[in-house]
Amino acid sequence: KKLSAQAIAILSIGSLCITSAGCNGKTKPAPIPPTEVNAALEMNPPIARSVEVQFKPDDPNGNLFVVADFGQGTIKGEFHAIMAGEEKVVLRDDGLGGDGTKGDGVFTAALSEDMDATAEHLRGISTGMKALISRPTFVGRERVARDTSLSRMVPFDRAAFVSGAKFPLIPAALCEPVTDVSIEHSLMVTNVGVVEDPTRTSQPCTRPDATGAWTFGKLMTDMANTASTGVSGEEFVKNWLKSWLAPTVVNGDPLPARTNLFNLVIRPWVIASGSAPGSFTIADWDTKPLDLGKAPFKLTAIVNRLDLRGNSGYTISNAGEGRFVFGTLNGTCAPTSFTVIFEYGVPIKKCRRLVDYARQWYDLRTHAIGSAAYNAALQAVTDVFAAANADPAKPNGSAINQIRTNEIALGSPWELREFNVDATTHQLFLTTVKQEPAKKYNAMAAPPVLPSDVTVMADWVNANATDIISDRHTVPLDIGGVPFLGGKSHTLSGGFWNAASGQILDPEARHHFSLNTCSGCHGRETRTDFLQVGTPPFGTAAVLAGFLIGITVNDPVSGTSRTFADLERRKDDLAKLMCRCKGRRLFDLAHVLTFKPIHMTH
């Protein structure tokens, strides 16, 4: 039988009750399909152009709505999962569940939070940020006069917020500012009382046979991890030294032998280890004992590089780095122009643990630098990444990411090399330098340079200008199957990267590309005289380059004035990191939506 119009109406109302409202008349939350976090986005996440929060007390999806504008087309699909602290949050752009317009690139996440606690925190950061509006800040690695984003910061009006007004969540204003981070204690440790600690460091001419926690020999031995690999520390170091003595090719880039290493480093070291002068040659020195306690390397700095971490909203496979900087000594323990940097990954995988570790660095300020208490606390920090088996998932169980060298002591020009640990042989091997093509692609390199090679570089820069200017690019291993990334980096006096006049269309792209290379950062782009951390004689702290402590440089091509002060940038970064993962999901979410990792290796 046909139903009457009244019956159809009643059934329709009942259907609406079942599908969208529930029988008590309350609207049901809009469902979210299973959505996984994309770990591949850790180093290249989508960055929200703006983030706002809005209070909606009667919405069934939640009471706080985070609205993130990524721009249309930035994120593919209608749902985007991200970790806020230790909890997954799914944002939506399907026009449902509190989202505005479907497919407009403005994603919404519904949270259920304590309104009073949230309002109090918003009030606190609104008040605290007033003092920072005129303070210099950083765009990428460059210091600018002030953070223009803070101009959007408005006083928190609780009544307006409770009534539904949106409040902006500014990346620089997600927590009360921490202003007392100590660069000397917690970021770049060069104090003589630390780097010449008599129990943890070495002085091969006056304190031979040192095997303390921060000595070159101890760190290399732990890197070899004999108990796990069967490779002794001595064998590990000998193979590394031998790699300098023969010519080789890395990714199509020829590396000549640096045989002066034999006379500068190897010969004096083998003699100090007990062999008679004249009893060995460059061909058979490796048959003689090499005492790692007499290694001719002086610790010059211990460096916190947590700022190199990825975006924890997607995963924490890259928690930043911890570094030891060594200067090479000659046979009389005088410093040479040859630095060796051990760059370890921080083996931490959880947000809360990473924040606690950042606070360990920060808390070093409570001790007198160079005191017994300070040095013990610092060793507790460095053991996390430097000890044997610090990261069992990596080759040799070592957390080492790479060893980098920068020297002219072995011959002109200044040359930078990079070494990784091989998972099969358990030895160090030469690998490509990062973010720098082979020098043949640089019009500023010593002749002969082919215009066709330079054009390859210029075309790549032009094609990737947007990512390069935002420091989100990665120089590829090859282009069209032809090797591109360099096997070494040569830093010439006054050197930088460029093409023929007019070939690189955007001068900012040229600058950022050149700045991100080893040679550009250690050269003309920052007015650095090759070394960011100098090698001083014993009893003297290392001299730091202007790029670290503050310098204004005119662009070598455009003439644009730029100011760098990277330790200040790292100071701000450590302060912001310590605000994370405190159970304030709203603010953790806003942070990961706006945090852009840096790709620069320096």
Write out the residue ranges for each language-model feature.
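Conserved small-residue
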Residues: 138-490, 525, 552-556, 562-568, ...
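Bacterial N-terminal signal peptides
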Residues: 8-19
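Aromatic sugar-binding surface patches on proteins
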Residues: 98-113
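Bacterial Sec-dependent N-terminal signal peptides
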Residues: 17-47, 602
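Solvent-exposed serine/threonine-rich low-complexity stretches and specific carbohydrate-binding patches
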Residues: 87-98
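The canonical Cys-X-X-Cys-His
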Residues: 515-525
